[in-house]
C-alpha cells in the first residue's frame, strides 16, 4: 500500500535563530554573517536540509552509532529508511521529504503591527589567547517570537513500519526541541518549538487518524 502522509505545522523561534546564507558579498559595515533568505520574498527561511540534517544527527546518536562510525551511511537501519543512504551499491531513498519552512503570514502581520524587525544583529567578540587581539563580528539572527510554516511528507512503503517510523520522527523532534538549530547554539541561539497542526493522508488510502508525533 503506497501512500503519502503530510505533516503540517509551525516552528516557533524561542531564541534568536542563525542559519547562515552563504554566497553573499559583505561590504564594509555590512553584517558579517547574514541569515539565509527566500530570494522571492527576501524573508528569512529555515532550509529543509537544516531541519532534516539536525533531526538525523540527533536521532542517530540517540539510537546509537556503530563504534568508530565515520559516515552517515553506516547509521542504523531505522535511520537509513527514514533519511536515506547514498552509499554506492546500496542507495536508499529517504521516506521523509522536509520542505523549506517559510516565515508565516501571521508572524509578518504581528511583527509589522508591533513595528518589530524580522531579524536582529547580535554582536560577538572573540579574543586571541596568543595576541590578545579582539575579533568582533556581527551575526544576523531571526528575531525571537517569529514563526515558520513547515510541512513534511512521509512515504508509506511498508505499513508494518509506519508506527515505528512515526515514533522515531516524534523522538527526533523532541531531541531537536531540547537542542538547537543553526549556528551558535552553545551561545544561546537556535532554540525552537514544533507545533503540529495536522497529520493527514494526501495520496493513497492509509489510515493516518491514529498517528501523532507530539
Curated annotation (Swiss-Prot):
Species per Swiss-Prot/TrEMBL record:
Enterococcus italicus (strain DSM 15952 / CCUG 50447 / LMG 22039 / TP 1.5)
EC annotation from Swiss-Prot or TrEMBL = 3.1.-.-
The record's subunit annotation is: Part of the Csm effector complex that includes Cas10, Csm2, Csm3, Csm4 and Csm5.
Would the keyword Nuclease be found if you checked this record's keyword annotation? yes
Q: Which InterPro entries match?
A: CRISPR-assoc_RAMP_Csm3 (IPR013412), CRISPR_Csm3_endoribonuclease (IPR052216), RAMP_III_fam (IPR005537)
The protein here is known as CRISPR system Cms endoribonuclease Csm3
The miscellaneous remark of the record is: Encoded in a type III-A CRISPR locus.
Molecular-function annotations in GO: endonuclease activity; RNA binding
Concerning Pfam families, the annotation shows: RAMPs (PF03787)
One of the protein's GO biological processes: defense response to virus
Q: Which UniProt keywords apply?
A: Antiviral defense, Endonuclease, Hydrolase, Nuclease, RNA-binding
The top EC class, named as a word, is: hydrolase
Q: Which gene encodes it?
A: csm3
Q: What does this chain do?
A: CRISPR (clustered regularly interspaced short palindromic repeat) is an adaptive immune system that provides protection against mobile genetic elements (viruses, transposable elements and conjugative plasmids). CRISPR clusters contain spacers, sequences complementary to antecedent mobile elements, and target invading nucleic acids. CRISPR clusters are transcribed and processed into CRISPR RNA (crRNA). This subunit has the target ssRNA endonuclease activity; it cleaves multiple sites in the target RNA at 6 nucleotide intervals.
Task: Work out whether the entry's keyword set contains Protein transport.
Answer: no
Tell me which family the UniProt entry assigns to this protein: Belongs to the CRISPR-associated Csm3 family.
| Matches recorded under NCBIfam families | cas7_TM1809
